[in-house]
């Protein structure tokens, strides 16, 4: 009996040491080690390890962008690094015009008759039907996020036109269930964002309101107190440093100003109190904003560095970085389709009998690595050199700086 207890303790210590070693390994090595043994796979797919790894990777956020061309029609992952300071961009080979939602490194892409959920880090893909009686897709209001209590990822689909249908899909079980009706009718097309276990939608009509859905309790709340003096149709709702944030570009005299406000939640019993504080007020040089009255322009924050520098992009495919210490704006890219910030996530997407299968060429469960002309073809001498020396293909970009006027 004593010998069994010692053996048990020994195995526990070994597993604990393995976990610490795995935490510091690059993603490619971790994915390979999953195939070594059942014990290693169990450690690497455990909720504890996945959460610890995700927390560590939050200190190294990347940017997820869409890349599309006529050469490759099948979706694929294009790992490509573009460094400006500590900024790294990972490319997903997909149609940039397709609606997409992201949460913690997972991407939900909608297409006619399907929801596609992809883990960019592991390459796992799951496809789901839109549920019973979904109504026309053009009438859907969608959301995608993570239940912070159970860790489960969920898709929300609401229809306010022709039929009133409100459903929520559990990615793990693959089953749809009904949601209670929200307290407000929302405008179709409102973009959603998930922050700390809740999905938020911004409604801009006669009045301003943010609709919030708690993914664990599956209940709705309304956020009514907004900085209403500057909320417009171009206001962007984002997750910035695990806080809900609003971004709006306004013109003050001859100057354009990018203002970003962050929301804090104070919970007292069953009630919640929402307050807003201004995080950034950035003067945009005239070369950043073209003052043409017929041209709409808005900016969306992506991430904030440890130094307080802000990465953001506009609706004309330009990516910028604002350096708070020197009050300068640098253009990182002039032609990029930013999807969102991206954090490595090893959360497995289980494939169960309840999931709907649909053939994607050779596999229903994997996105391929794309063979686009932008990168060396597999087997070429360039490809061999690249694979031997670096994990990601590096692209040097010459940036240019916008100094304040």
From Swiss-Prot:
The lineage of its organism: Eukaryota, Viridiplantae, Streptophyta, Embryophyta, Tracheophyta. This is F-box/kelch-repeat protein At2g43445. Residues 7-53 form the F-box domain. Kelch repeats lie at residues 146-197, 356-400. It comes from Arabidopsis thaliana. It comes from the Eukaryota. The keyword Repeat applies. Keywords: Kelch repeat, Repeat.
């Amino acid at each position: 009996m004593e010998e069994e207890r010692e053996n048990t303790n020994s195995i526990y210590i070994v597993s604990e040491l393995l976990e610490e070693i795995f935490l510091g390994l690059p993603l490619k090595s971790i994915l390979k080690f999953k195939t070594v043994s059942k014990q290693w796979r169990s450690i690497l797919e455990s909720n504890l390890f996945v959460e610890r790894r995700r927390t560590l990777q939050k200190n190294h956020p990347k940017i997820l962008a869409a890349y599309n061309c006529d050469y490759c029609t099948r979706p694929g992952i294009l790992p490509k690094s573009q460094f400006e300071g500590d900024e790294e961009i990972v490319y997903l080979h997909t149609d940039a015009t397709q609606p997409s939602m992201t949460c913690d490194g997972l991407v939900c892409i909608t297409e006619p008759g399907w929801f596609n959920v992809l883990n960019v880090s592991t390459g796992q893909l799951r496809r789901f039907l839109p549920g019973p009686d979904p109504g026309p897709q053009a009438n859907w209001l969608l959301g995608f996020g993570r239940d912070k209590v159970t860790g489960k990822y969920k898709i929300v689909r609401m229809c306010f036109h022709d039929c009133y249908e409100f459903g929520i899909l559990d990615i793990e079980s693959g089953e749809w269930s009904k949601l209670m009706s929200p307290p407000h009718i929302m405008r179709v097309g409102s973009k959603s964002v998930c922050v700390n276990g809740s999905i938020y939608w911004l409604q801009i009509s006669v009045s301003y309101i943010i609709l919030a859905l708690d993914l664990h309790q599956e209940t709705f709340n309304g956020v009514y107190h907004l900085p209403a003096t500057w909320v417009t149709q171009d206001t962007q709702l984002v997750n910035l440093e695990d806080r809900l944030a609003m971004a709006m570009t306004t013109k003050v005299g001859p100057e354009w100003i990018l203002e970003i406000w962050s929301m804090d939640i104070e919970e007292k019993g069953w009630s919640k109190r929402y307050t807003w504080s201004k995080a950034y007020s950035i003067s945009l040089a005239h070369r950043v904003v073209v003052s043409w009255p017929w041209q709409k322009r808005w900016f969306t924050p992506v991430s904030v560095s440890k130094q307080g520098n802000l990465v953001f992009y506009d609706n004309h495919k330009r990516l910028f970085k604002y350096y708070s210490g020197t009050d300068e704006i640098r253009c990182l890219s002039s032609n990029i389709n930013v999807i969102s910030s991206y954090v490595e996530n090893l959360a497995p997407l289980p494939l169960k009998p309840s999931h709907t299968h649909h053939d994607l060429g050779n596999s229903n469960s994997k996105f391929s690595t794309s063979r686009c002309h932008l990168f060396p073809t597999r087997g070429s001498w360039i490809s061999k050199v690249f694979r031997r020396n670096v994990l990601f293909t590096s692209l040097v970009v010459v940036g240019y700086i916008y100094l304040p006027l």
